[in-house]
UniProtKB/Swiss-Prot annotation:
Disulfide bonds: none annotated. PANTHER family: 40S RIBOSOMAL PROTEIN S14/30S RIBOSOMAL PROTEIN S11. One of its GO terms (molecular function) is structural constituent of ribosome. One of its GO terms (cellular component) is ribosome. One of its GO terms (biological process) is translation. Gene3D superfamilies: Ribosomal protein S11 (3.30.420.80). The gene is rps11. It comes from the Eukaryota. The keyword Transmembrane helix does not apply. This is Small ribosomal subunit protein uS11c. The lineage of its organism: Eukaryota, Viridiplantae, Streptophyta, Embryophyta, Tracheophyta. It is found in: Plastid, Chloroplast.
Amino acid sequence: MAKSIPSAGLRLRLRLRRNARRRSRKSTRKIPKGVIHVQASFHNTIVTVTDVRGRVISWSSAGTCGFKSTRKGTPFAAQTAAGDAIRPVVDQGMQRAEVRIKGPGLGRDAALRAIRRSGIRLSCIRDVTPLPHNGCRPPKKRRV
């Protein structure tokens, strides 16, 4: 017996129903604990929220929040980016988090303040800025 081919309208409805199912399953995932990574450079601040295994749940940066050029490096931009990255995970039920801050930028403290204000309990705040152990050889001294 041959199957009948569904009409275009029916195919579209089936596809939409399948996509709706996928989306709803992803948003209902509860994440009780996570890790918040703050990368603060002099020119931008990037905030990434992951679960304990390291899978990215949400991220934001000063650039994606609408700040351009030199304003991306400001503390206010970092605060906005942190709030923007944390809002979806608070809705998903995150209660505790560990914060890892990397970089020398101005947005370090502002992002941390925004994270504290969000209502997530912080279990640990760790500075993971890479430091050289006498890294590369400096250029030779300039003779004038």
